Every structure is written in structure tokens, then in C-alpha cells.
Amino acid sequence: MLKNINPTQTQAWKALTAHFESAQDMDLKALFAQDSERFAKYSARFGQDILVDYSKNLVNAETMQHLFALAKETDLQSAITAMFKGEAINQTEDRAVLHTALRNRSNSPVLVNGEDVMPAVNAVLAKMKAFSERVIGGEWKGFTGKAITDVVNIGIGGSDLGPYMVTEALVPYKNHLTMHFVSNVDGTHMAETLKNVDPETTLFLVASKTFTTQETMTNAHTARDWFLKAAGDEAHVAKHFAALSTNGKAVAEFGIDTDNMFEFWDWVGGRYSLWSAIGLSIILSIGYDNFVELLAGAHEMDQHFVNTPFESNIPVILALIGIWYNNFHGAESEAILPYDQYLHRFAAYFQQGNMESNGKYVDRDGNPVTYQTGPIIWGEPGTNGQHAFYQLIHQGTKLIPCDFIAPAVSHNLVGDHHQKLMSNFFAQTEALAFGKSAQAVQAELEKAGKSAAEIAALVPFKVFEGNRPTNSILVKQITPRTLGNLIAMYEHKIFVQGVIWNIFSFDQWGVELGKQLANQILPELADSAAVTSHDSSTNGLINAFKAFRA
């Protein structure tokens, strides 16, 4: 059980509130000028391959001291221990939270209700290994005797976002199989995917724990119907469909051999499920050995998180700095900006990871909170974002803390592309931190031969205030192991913030109401009769929809 501690009632929170009165005037230029060792003091290395520089943040030693005190006063250490021990910290669903067990490469026992889950975890891994080797090696044949060339993962939310992000991030490690991901119940998503695959050589993975998820099962049945138009015999379904599920009865009724059903457990949350059987598409894309490297990387970060004092603990530090901006500076969003095209889905993945976890307005006592909880998460790869939204980050009126992520070594050594990419990576955090003064702008314009009148008119528009905070996360190279490090780092950051905010991070009741109402509305769309059972707006929209289709 997690303790119920209102963070605003702690001494540390009160100290941070008082500290903010002077800290809101903090100036990064001055902080660096005052301390030549600032980078060394406010950066951390993870192993040999990751450097996290948090020196360009609006914090000093006193800020960090109070933030670490907040972590201790809200009993973060007990919460970490409870999660890793398999206690039911997802209290509203009475479930343990053990995605960490899925990547427990030490194989030390992890108990849920007194039973070690590791034998079951290892059994599913072994089953996925054997299955994937048959498919990748060409031993698995389709209904006409041809080997599989394409894999279509049908899922939504955690059954889609994680595997899609990872397979894209690790394209340099992929084999000959072509991966496709279908999530949206909009028929266009499935229709466009099916245009590009051959029923004789396509394997579908249906990812739904209950095998009842509306979007996933709608898409799965559409894929099955399309397949049977070519194959004819329903017995052939078993050669082209596998299930990531626990509902053996429904899987068998669909036509899938339950030998090709890969299970996971109720202690695996959807947005943390890529480490489970939901990761089968990852294994089919990059091979089992690389998937194990991904698990190993995450396990390394788990060990760091569990065993490192808060003052040197990377996920804890990042979480606390995020709380400083969210709850004291009034920042409403955070941007994740990977300078690596392979990571183009990384921000979208953690948009779900963060916003579904910490988008809560009720505390662990069931009372509305009186403080801000989860931030809005967004982002795009650099340098694309520089030509889209960085304008607002640099010169807008909103404070947007940013995480910049980049590899030192590219997988594609094309001319001087990577040096140009990285020059932008380094330049952006420098520009955001230190800006450009009116004097510097004036000197620049004078050098360009502008008149005094032109200079006076232009200067205000060309000044950069700076003092925009950033973290820089430099990775030697994006590999399965370092990607595992990064994903687990952000997972634990989110967990830490939820603990301190006194909310439950592992349920997601906010997705339920819309689904319930959609199930009520669906039969109302079956005919042309006018609808009157809702509010005037919803009635008007449904009736306009029907009129457009008449």
C-alpha cells in the first residue's frame, strides 16, 4: 500500500514555496558565471553510454536540497520498494505493478500473492523465442506453403504505441520482415495497410488481453475477412494469426491455435506492456537476442533506480526538476525533442506514458487535489521542430521545459549530416539558456550596416530572453540496450512524480466514460431515425451526420 501524504502539507513543499520567491529571479547566465563547476555538479552519467546534463535548469543547490527533502518526506523510498516487491500499489484495481519483473534479467524471485512470477515470465519468453525463430527463419509457412514476409500488429494504446515506437527506433537492427501497425478503428488504417500486404505471406498479431477491445477486435475481424477471401478455408486462419491475450476461449473461437497465444498478466499495465508478450512484434522485427538486450537495458536502469541515493538517481532527479516547473513555476507542458529520426515516435509513446499515468485530479484518499498533477507531453524530432514550434519555446510567453535527446554516433554515416544535426542540438540548448541581449542584437545590426532608425525598430523583435530550461540527454548510440535504459528512465520518472503528487499512476479510469457512451450511441447510428436522447449539441451532431449520409 502506498501512503497518503499530501505533498503541499510537507515541510519541504513549504520550504520550496518560500524558496521560489527568490528563485523565480534565477538567471542561468549568472548561475554559470558564478560556478565554473556547474556542469560537473549538475550532470550524471549512466554507465559508459549515457550522459544526462541538467545544469541548464533554473535550480541551485538550495532548490535541489528542498526537492530531495520532498522525495524523502513523501516516502518515495517505501513506494519504490513496494512496487518492486509486488505489492498491490495499483489500489483501485487491486493489482501489483510489475513490468519490472518482465525484464528482471537477474531472475531473482518476484512474488505476487506469495508466488514467484519469474518461471511464468521465462516460459512466455521461451515460447516467443521459439515462435519468432520459426517465422524469421522461414520455417513457419502460410496456407500456400510460402514463408512469412509481413507482420501486421493489431492493437491500440499500449498494445500499439510501445511496439511501434521500439521497432521504429531499432530499424538498424531489423531483419527482412516488414512490420505494420494498425490501431485506429477508422477503417482507413486497416484498408491502407491491407493494400500493401499479400494474404499468402502475412502474419497478423492480435494484441488484446481480453480479446474484447472494440477497436482491436473490429480490425482483427476485418483482417480475418480479408484473409479468408483469398484463403477460403477457415482452417488456414491458424497459419496467419497469433494472439497476445489471456482469453483462450475467444482466441480459439476466432480460429487461432491457442499454442500460438502468448499470455501476460493483470500486473502488466498496458502502457508498460512492450516488455511482455505485447513485444512479440519487436522480437519478430529485430530478433530475440536484441529483444533480450532491450530488456537488459531496462533492467540496468531498474537497478540504478532501486539502489542509487536520490541525490545521484537519474529518474528521481528528472522527476523532481519536473515538479519544480510544474508546481512552482506554473509550467503546463514538457517537450521531448529527440535529435534522431529513428526516435520519431518517442515523444508520442511517453505522451501516453505520462498523461495516462498522471492525468489525475483525485488523490489517493479520493479527494480532489489542490495542486497541479501531470503535465502535457509533446514533441517532434529535431531539426524538424526548429522550423515548426521552437519559435514559441524561444520567444513565447509560456515556460516549456525541454528534454533534448541525441546519439553521439549515428547509424547512418551520410556525409556531414550528423555533425550538422548535432551542431543544432548543442546550439538550441545554449540559445534557450542564454538567449541574445539587446546589446548583442544592436552590435549585429550595426555590423550588417543598418541605420540607427532601422536598428531601433528591429532590436525588440530580435532579442532572446533566454532562461528557458532544458535537460540534455546524450547517448553514445541508440542500441537495444541504451533504448531500454532510456525507456525505463522515463517510466521511473513518471512513477516518482505520481508518488509525490499522491495520486494513483497505474489506473486509467479516464478512458472509460467515452467508451461507455460510444457503446450507447453505436446502435443509434444504425438507421436514419432522428435522435433525441442526448443533449441538444450531441443530438444535433448525430442528426447532421445521418443527414450527410442520406
Curated annotation (Swiss-Prot):
Presence of the UniProt keyword Hydrolase in the record: no
One cellular component term from this protein's GO annotations in UniProt: cytosol
InterPro entries: G6P_Isomerase, G6P_Isomerase_C, Phosphoglucose_isomerase_CS, SIS_dom_sf, SIS_PGI_1, SIS_PGI_2
Enzyme class: isomerase
One Gene Ontology biological process: gluconeogenesis
EC number: 5.3.1.9
Superkingdom classification of source: Bacteria
UniProt xrefs under HAMAP family: G6P_isomerase (MF_00473)
Protein name: Glucose-6-phosphate isomerase
Source organism (scientific name): Vibrio cholerae serotype O1 (strain ATCC 39541 / Classical Ogawa 395 / O395)
Phylogenetic classification of the source organism: Bacteria, Pseudomonadati, Pseudomonadota, Gammaproteobacteria, Vibrionales
Gene that this sequence comes from: pgi
